């Protein structure tokens, strides 16, 4: 029995001085039980009691706006001689018995400020997310289609001749394009059998093929040399002829093409000079034969003259006079 009582006494006695102080002080016990209450204690006055509100017969007037819609808020620095009031009309604070500060109207509410900032921040975030949101595949496809359509509108139509080209070449294009069955163009040399074929996109790929034949010399230049001007620069040994097969109503049209100066002065409108005449002959096997003479200083299909219109007229007049003198 004595040993049991001794053990219980040993367990009940504190092990050190700190535990004895904690058990003896009732304040520490209350703090251990309710820590929130102990944190709120410094907000009360130094004596541990809540200070009473000032008892006034009527509400104080606001020194700024003279409004009676005021209320007591708190004591400044826990001093009862400095009560702090708030005016609900102009939403400003002041201390009774103290000096007034230059405070703007409506600057005393913190809750509204925080709420407005939060609303503003959410609005800006939503707007930014809306602006930087990734595009859906449908919007990407529509935008790409719009860009492709814009580029296609800028590219000229290659299948149909534009009004400007038809205005520049009113008589050249109809003669080069077959009217009956259509078809491509094949420019072939007789001796070397070199051809340059191309098919216009606006014409079908069926029908007779026109021929460009050059004769009169054994050493025929190549087509590139012809383009550079080897055969079209007034050489009298070559006699070029364009044989073009028509479709249903072909006819012989021997004429000499106008000079470069005449084409420039007339704007390529199809008007010719005196020597560039167009004579319509009888039908011959449904073929339209266009021949160019050498009297015009080597006028040919690709009429690459670099002289002016007046110089060509003078040369033509001189040639006609020489022919008349020879005939006499």
Curated annotation (Swiss-Prot):
Residue positions binding Zn(2+): 62, 65, 87, 90
Subcellular localization: Nucleus
Signal peptide boundaries: none
ZnF segments: Dof-type: 60-114
GO CC terms: nucleus
Assembly and interaction partners: Interacts with the bZIP transcription factor Opaque-2/O2.
Function text: Transcription factor that binds specifically to a 5'-AA[AG]G-3' consensus core sequence. May enhance the DNA binding of the bZIP transcription factor Opaque-2 to O2 binding site elements.
Protein name: Dof zinc finger protein PBF
Organism from which the protein derives: Zea mays
């Amino acid at each position: 029995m004595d040993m049991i009582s001794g053990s219980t006494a040993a367990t009940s006695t504190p092990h050190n001085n700190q535990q004895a102080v904690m058990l003896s002080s009732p304040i520490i016990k209350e703090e251990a039980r309710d820590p929130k209450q102990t944190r709120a204690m410094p907000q009360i006055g130094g004596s541990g009691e809540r200070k009473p509100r000032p008892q006034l017969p009527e509400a104080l007037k606001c020194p700024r706006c003279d409004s009676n819609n005021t209320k007591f808020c708190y004591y400044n620095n826990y001093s009862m001689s400095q009560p702090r009031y708030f005016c609900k009309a102009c939403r400003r604070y002041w201390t009774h018995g103290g000096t007034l500060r230059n405070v703007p109207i409506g600057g005393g509410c913190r809750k509204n400020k925080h709420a407005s900032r939060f609303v503003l921040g959410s609005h800006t975030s939503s707007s930014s997310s809306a602006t930087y949101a990734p595009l859906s595949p449908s919007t990407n496809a529509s935008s790409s289609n719009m860009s492709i359509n814009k580029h296609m509108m800028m590219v000229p139509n290659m299948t149909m001749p534009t009004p400007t080209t038809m205005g520049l070449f009113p008589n050249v294009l109809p003669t080069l394009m077959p009217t009956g069955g259509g078809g491509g163009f094949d420019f072939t040399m007789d001796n070397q059998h070199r051809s340059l074929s191309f098919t216009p996109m606006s014409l079908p790929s069926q029908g007779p093929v026109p021929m460009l034949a050059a004769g009169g010399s054994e050493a025929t230049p190549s087509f590139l040399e012809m383009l550079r001007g080897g055969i079209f620069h007034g050489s009298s040994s070559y006699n070029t002829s364009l044989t073009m097969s028509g479709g249903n109503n072909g006819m012989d049209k021997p004429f000499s093409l106008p000079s470069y100066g005449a084409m420039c002065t007339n704007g390529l409108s199809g008007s010719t000079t005196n020597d560039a005449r167009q004579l319509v002959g009888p039908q011959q096997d449904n073929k339209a034969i266009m021949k160019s003479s050498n009297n015009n200083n080597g006028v040919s299909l690709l009429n690459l003259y670099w002289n002016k219109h007046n110089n060509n007229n003078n040369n033509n007049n001189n040639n006609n006079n020489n022919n008349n003198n020879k005939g006499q």
